[in-house]
Amino acid sequence: SDLLSGGMKRRVGLVQALLHEPDFLIVDEPTTGLDPEERIRIRNLLVDFAEERTVLFSTHVVEDLMATCNQLAVMKKGRFLYTGTMRELLNKARGHVWECCTEDESLARELERKYHISSKQYTEEGIRLRLLGENMPSESGCIACDVTLEDAYIYVTNR
């Protein structure tokens, strides 16, 4: 087994599990350590397998969820915070995600204290922040934006 890479070990384990054609399959981080093409192959394999069976996916890789799941559950410290469809989860965070761009470092720090930040970038225009919270920022230059699955996860787990 020392001859196999982490990705190869993952593939071998998945094939072993699929050989028995279980009615219920649990996969934990099945695409971690795989190159992008292999990730897609594994996702497609699991989607095909799930057509007639139940596959429980445990992962932190948002792309895996978006490509494979029609039902989601979000857990924190052993408690379910959300169960339902991806669309319903995205709707929970709708109206609670904004993007602000500022050249003012102190304003950026203040926004970071007041909101959950899902993204921070230094651009030619200034500091671009993606904020999540209950109320729209009063600072100028903040606009509502489309919700990503990552935004929805952060919103639900930090309420």
Task: Label every model-predicted segment.
Residues 33, 80, 140-143:
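Short N-terminal micro-motifs specific to bacterial/archaeal maturation
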Residues 19, 78, 138-140:
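Short, charged low-complexity intrinsically disordered segments located at boundaries
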Residues 42-130:
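ABC transporter nucleotide-binding domain
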Residues 1-76:
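ABC transporter nucleotide-binding domains
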Residues 115-159:
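C-terminal coupling/interaction segments
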